[in-house]
Amino acid sequence: MDLTNSTFLSNQLTPFLSFSREQWAELRKSVPLTLTEQDLKPLLGINEELSLDEVRTIYLPLVRLINYYIEERIQRQQVMNRFLGVNPDKVPYIISIAGSVAVGKSTSARILQSLLSQWPERRKVDLITTDGFLYPLAKLQQDNLLHKKGFPVSYDTARLVRFLADIKSGKPKVSAPVYSHLIYDIVPDQFDVVDQPDILILEGLNVLQTGDRSSQTFVSDFVDFSIYVDADEDLLKAWYISRFLKFRQSAFSDPNSYFKHYATLSEPEAISTAGRIWDEINGLNLRENILPTRERANLILTKGTDHAVELVKLRK
């Protein structure tokens, strides 16, 4: 790819290099595609139709880039170890994935986990979502915060920071709480155990937030490479409503579902309800707390109408 062209030169006054879909695809080079259609299907979200072409075009160049960063980090760590004369515990490389509800963060995280684990080094790649660090439903109800679920105030951030501090210190068998979307709550006495992986992918709404830098340690302080998955709010709202309609016919009909009362809504009622939830909760959270963190990411993936990434921005 010719990086002397006008598109590249226009990036000179910004903190990011911008790539069209076609330009980014060229950076795949010779990275092989290790996923099949059969492998891809279970990685997709309920409202996403992501093709192998998207994996080739967007995710293979990204995996190539991340592996360069990991190799560079390993080399720097080896230099430090020789200087200090120490043989420290293995420290995982942490990748965070942020973005709005319904943008496809979870799908991106699962695809990256699969691709990175199949790299020739056969690295161990774990995936944790920050949903597990939401306060329990009873506490949110007690504190009158149910309408703020997903907002920064609804997370046990101190617990999440301790979890990441343990991971980064090389501690083995670190436990993370498990969240169930079915019951809309933390699952009692159930944990995911992270045991010294080579890479940890952390996926969540607010993983790029920093708040008041003078007084706290933040999730972003532990992250080595951060990704923000972006789309226009009109698209996000439409995707959220479409997903809500599909849940109405599937997960909401489960008698154990917290949202089982939505299963009886007519389609117009469901569309109206989903739109109201977006306007009052998810859209508000996006504008107030999530979108303002976008420019802190190392990489921004901007999606278009069909969920395909149209623009990639890489921090210089």
Swiss-Prot record:
GO BP terms, alphabetized: coenzyme A biosynthetic process
Annotated binding of ATP, by residue: 99-106
Hydrolase as UniProt keyword: no
Catalytic reactions of this protein: (R)-pantothenate + ATP = (R)-4'-phosphopantothenate + ADP + H(+)
Protein name: Pantothenate kinase
A cellular component annotation (GO) from this entry: cytoplasm
The organism's place on the tree of life at top rank: Bacteria
Gene3D superfamilies named among the record's database cross-references: P-loop containing nucleotide triphosphate hydrolases
Subcellular location(s) of the protein: Cytoplasm
Keyword annotations: ATP-binding, Coenzyme A biosynthesis, Cytoplasm, Kinase, Nucleotide-binding, Transferase
Coiled coil stretches, renumbered: none
Major subcellular location class: cytoplasm
Keyword Iron-sulfur attributed: no
Cited PANTHER family: URIDINE KINASE (PTHR10285)
An example Gene Ontology molecular-function term: ATP binding
Pathway, per record: Cofactor biosynthesis; coenzyme A biosynthesis; CoA from (R)-pantothenate: step 1/5
Species of provenance: Pasteurella multocida (strain Pm70)
Listed EC numbers: 2.7.1.33
Family: Belongs to the prokaryotic pantothenate kinase family.
